[in-house]
Structures are given as C-alpha cells and as structure tokens.
Amino acid sequence: MNKKILVLGGGVAGASMAYYLTEKGYDVTILEKNSKIGGLARTCYYSGHPYEFGPHIWFWPGGTEAPINATVVKLTNDELFYIDRRLLTYVESDQRAYRYPVHYADVARMPERETIERELRQNRDGQLKLIESQLPEIGQCKFAEYFTAAIGATLYDKFMANYTWKMWNIPGDELETSMVWADRFSAATETGGAPTTTKVSGYDPLKFDDHTLGKGIRFQVYPKGGWNSVWDAMVTRSAIVRDTILGIQDEHRKPYVATASGTKYYFGDYHTVFSSIDIDRLWGEDTLPYTGRMMVPLLIPGLACAFPNGAESVHYSSCEFQTRVTEMKVITRHESPDTMLLIEIPILPGAAKVFPKNTLDYAIEHNLFAEKAYPQQSEQAFATYYGYVDRCKKIPNLRMVGRHAEFKYWGMAETVNSAYQKSLDFEAV
C-alpha cells in the first residue's frame, strides 16, 4: 500500500492534517514556504510580549473529551489557561464603551434609547423574543436586512453598519449573511461535530444575560507557552520541505505540483495530496477576493494595564481605521511592567506596495501583515471557487483542507476540526 501523503502548506490546516495522518502511520511530506510551521496562528514576540495574528483563543464544544480538544490537551501537556473573555465596543458618537456583543441592559445608557426600544419590538413578542417567522433567513439574505430586522436600524447603525463595512470592504446591504456568520454558528454550541451552514435561523444578536464570545463553552483556552509548541509537535513525524508552491501543472496528462526550486511533485507518487493553500493559488492564479489585516503592536512603557476591568479587546464600531484593539497580556498572562496593544486594521489587495520595504519585511516575518486573511464569499466569488473545486475533481487523489483551501470563514478550531474529520476517512496503516 502507498502510505505517502503530500501536504501543501504548513499552517494550522496543513500541520493538523499531517498530525492526524502520521498518528495513523502515514508518511507525510509538507511543502511550506516559510521557515516555521503554524501560519498566522504561530506565536510571535514583540519586546518579549507574545502575540498572534489577532487573539487566537481556542474554543470548541464538548470539553476535554472532544477529539480535537483532546489533541490540544495532549500537545500542551494540559498546560492551559482557561479564558473568560471580557469584550467591549467603543461607539465614538456616544463617547462611550458598551459590552460586546450588544446587551439589552446597555440600551438604557444610550442617547437614542426610546427610539431603540420602539424599534426592538417590531419583530419581537412581549418577552422580547425574536419572532422567527418575521425574520429573513440567514444565508438567504443580506447582512443589513437580517440585523436591522433583529435589532432595529438605530442599533444596527451604531454597532454594525460601519464596522462590518470596514471589516469586509463590503457594505451591509451587499454583504451575504452566509459569508459572515453561517460558517461559524453551528460550532458555537455544546453539540460538537463538523461545522455546517445548514438551517441557521432565529439568531439573536441582542443579549439579555451577561454574555461574551464562547460563553457556555467549557473548553476555551490558551496554551501557557503560546501556540508554537502545538504546531511544532504536530509535525515532528513529518518531513518538511521549505519551498514555494507555484501551482499544478500538466493537469490533463501527468499532473504535478510545480515549485520554485524546480522540484516536481507528481500526484501519481502519493496516496493523497492535501492542499491547505488558497485554492486559486493552487492553480497558479489569483482570482478569489479576500480582505487582509495589518497588525500594529503598540507597546506602552510603564503602563501595566490599559483596559478597564480586565477587558481583553475593544471593538471600534465607527469609521476609525481599526476594527479591534487587544491587550494581549490579558490572554497570554505575560508578566511585564509594560503592556502591549495589538491594533487590527483591515487592508485590501495591493496594500503592501505603500509601505517601506524594511517595515513590510519585518511585518510579514512577524505575522503582522497578510493581504489574504478573510475570504469574501460573494455570489460571484462562490461561483469562482466552485469552478476550482470542479477542476480539482479531475485529479482523483487531490483533496482540500482548511479555511483557505475550502474558502471558509473559520477560526482555528474549525480548521483543525476540518483536518480531523478528513482523517477519519483513512484507516491506520
């Protein structure tokens, strides 16, 4: 039996795929362009302060017995911080911060509270529960359409309209709900299983009890030593080749993966080839739309704590450049008399051209800059994506894994779960 597996890309998806298949006895080779494994989830350091490309808190239902949670426990020797997230939104027009996500109790503090109360009741019953029959269907409507119906025009404008636009570079009345929410809703329950986008309905963005991201999920953690030991441990039994993938060549006759070094990796030599890179880049093309992120690490000397009451992040809902600012030591528990804020700024393709080369090289090397971070899942983009999927099917032993290859708005846990689910198709050898 051919036990050889080729994995394209050594980010979270590629490392996870390699881990689950080497656990079953397969011989795995990883092609990765960077010097280190883990992609944008790798822990980097600025003046000794650990950070990732935005906060990388792991949360997944099922507790420590869930298979992918058990993987994290095993690879960290259970050296984990359990996280209770405190998040805020700053509304510039109100000159005030509110809890994130939107809480009903905070409406009383808002200047337009009477209008908001009236709008909230348009699609709710006497107990302020959403009336599902009056709501648009998530996945079949625009973002603005659903959330205006759910919380009213005033709250939508205050918290979501500009934030969503700057995050995706798509106005809410053009943004598909399938793009932003559906990929991740089903994972945020205690039922577990593979993420799915089906039958999402009745989601209420307004919270009536004290709520935060991941609340109620038992396994919400950050490794005490950062994420690097996890990704490194995942690939200890794999062969890692540092090379840049140029794309698939000779697809109709004898397909192979071409690389910058000149080495050709023929599909016929492998049991399976898993690609975790952008599916358009797999074919040497650049057609799928993404928004990117620039991270600015701002170290404040002599200030031990910047945000009130142990808050982790502040979201900025207006037209400021930044979407979110995170005080990383709240997550990492790094001990220092100084604090470091990680400022997230959306960027568009071509942004790299406007920065000095030395700063850009530093940013890319230290996970502070990525032009392709979040897929823009418009109807046109999906059509392009599924065109690539059909093209990939012509190579029988080629499979996709992870958020980039599968064109999903997934977090870290959903990505690892994608690899785990695919590994179940393989018998131990």
Model-assigned labels for residue ranges:
Residues K24, G247-A373, Q377, Y385-R391:
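Mid-domain catalytic core of redox enzymes
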Residues A13, K36, D280:
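Conserved Rossmann-like nucleotide-cofactor binding loop
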Residues R124-Y265, D269:
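Active-site/ligand-binding neighborhood in enzyme catalytic cores
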Residues S47-Q134:
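Dinucleotide-binding Rossmann-like beta1-alpha1 core, especially the glycine-rich loop
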